[in-house]
Amino acid sequence: MAARCWVWGFVVALLAVAAAADGEEEEGKWEPLIRMPTEEGDDAEAAAPAPAPAAADYGGTRWAVLVAGSSGYGNYRHQADVCHACQILQKGGVKEENIVVFMYDDIAHNILNPRPGTIINHPKGGDVYAGVPKDYTGHQVTTENFFAVLLGNKTAVTGGSGKVIDSKPEDHIFIYYSDHGGPGVLGMPNLPYLYAGDFIKVLQKKHASNSYSKMVIYVEACESGSIFEGLMPENLNIYVTTASNAVENSWGTYCPGEEPSPPPEYITCLGDMYSVAWMEDSETHNLKKETIEDQYELVKKRTSNANKLNEGSHVMEYGDKTFKDEKLFLYQGFNPANGNITNELIWPVPKATVNQRDADLLFMWKRYEQLNGVSEDKLRALREIEDTIAHRKHLDSSIDFIGKLVFGFENGPLALEAARSSGQPLVDNWDCLKKMVRIFESQCGSLTQYGMKYMRAFANICNNGVSEAKMMEASINACGRYNSARWSPMTEGGHSA
């Protein structure tokens, strides 16, 4: 089912339900021979081997930072992704003391979780939550803590385990991030967001400290290519792949109503397309034979969703591409159970996906459907859907009107949406971008994870030399009559910048 068809059907259904308030699932078709390594079953558990040595076959230590940048049960998939990644690294022999995990940790024991205390990342998968270290959880999952951990700065971290990447010149570092994003930004459950300009500076500082040999970064988020496009140097010994290019969405997968679908008791997406692609690849390959480039090409092919890029995305690569021939075990470890696996990737191909920015609406709608009869909980769920859609429409119309006020009624929308040519960064002045975001939110309410997509509009306002005073005037005119109490930055945990 195409995402646009789902969205239209959702809106029609919502209108019908709202009007009423005022006055056998298709089984997923699975190849019977396919069994994922995390699939439930006593035989698979009994065959699980002992972990491999952490530093086998090379001098140095493997380090990893895993970040789930969201919170809330509707964003189940991001923490599922990160927990799954942690399981892969642990089975590969990467020591827990060398893995730093950022996750809000509000999913496994959530009242909506049909299997309390567990998290799954695959429709037929087993628990990926058990044994995952909770280094930074809840309010400790911040951009500042992430940067401090990466830099190995123990005095700069706030709360948590205090664990940091205390790496040495011969060590290898793997960073994996999964969440919502927008042009030039990555989400965090505690504001402000992570901005590309700041992230690149931190990577440069890490390189200047001579505290690693090579680093590999995987990023799952909408417009994730914009974090590195025109910004990522090629001389830092850092290789990056992203789920999407600088101008497109990434996609959730294993979602309710899609094929393959999660177990019927789940009302939210279990994973993200790029993320499950690389993890299911790593689980079914000998990582002492598979190279970084091998995985990039396989993940690129799968994430394009058979070239249906209206339901898939372009996986991109940035930074230093000279060491793509290195074997993946240097970063993800080696699971002895995969020692005799031939490099033939086997996966169930999703028939459809859900736009990252629509996945929360899908969850809310499934939650509404799940509630029986006419109850206060069901009416509350309906109001939440209506409020969320109304705020989205408000953001859409406000940004559009600000563009017309700033650039003229004829050219405004095009000026806001214009993407720079390949190789150029999103914005010339990152401080200006942050200021424009704060001005907008002060008058128009929080951007939310949906509104992150408008970061390019704010960047273009900066790139065209619009003053703060003019932006404030336009924001007041666009939003002066909007009651933003429900969506105030103070209510939503602060400003996005």
UniProtKB/Swiss-Prot annotation:
Glycan attachment residues as annotated in the record: N153, N340
InterPro entries for the chain: AE (IPR043577), Legum_prodom (IPR048501), Legumain_prodom_sf (IPR046427), Peptidase_C13 (IPR001096)
Processing and modification events after translation: Auto-catalytic activation.
Site-annotated residues for Required for post-translational maturation and enzyme activity: C269
GO molecular function: cysteine-type endopeptidase activity
GO BP: protein storage vacuole organization; proteolysis involved in protein catabolic process; vacuolar protein processing
Disulphide-bridged cysteine pairs: C255-C269, C432-C462, C444-C479
Entries under Pfam families matching the protein: Legum_prodom (PF20985), Peptidase_C13 (PF01650)
Residue positions of the active site: H180, C222 (nucleophile)
Signal peptide: 1-23
Gene Ontology terms: cellular component: protein storage vacuole
Compartments (UniProt record): Protein storage vacuole
Keywords linked to the UniProt accession: Disulfide bond, Glycoprotein, Hydrolase, Protease, Signal, Thiol protease, Vacuole
Gene3D superfamilies xref list: 1.10.132.130, 3.40.50.1460
Enzyme class (EC, first level): hydrolase
Enzyme Commission code(s) on record: 3.4.22.34
Main subcellular location: other
Catalytic activity: Hydrolysis of proteins and small molecule substrates at -Asn-|-Xaa- bonds
PANTHER family in alphabetical order: HEMOGLOBINASE FAMILY MEMBER (PTHR12000), VACUOLAR-PROCESSING ENZYME BETA-ISOZYME 1 (PTHR12000:SF25)
Family: Belongs to the peptidase C13 family.
Main function: Asparagine-specific endopeptidase that may be involved in processing of proteins targeted to vacuoles. Cysteine protease required for post-translational proteolysis of seed storage proteins in the protein storage vacuole (PSV) of developing seeds, by processing of proglutelin precursor to mature glutelin subunits, thus contributing to the formation of protein crystalline structures in PSV.
Protein name: Vacuolar-processing enzyme beta-isozyme 1
Source organism: Oryza sativa subsp. indica (Rice)
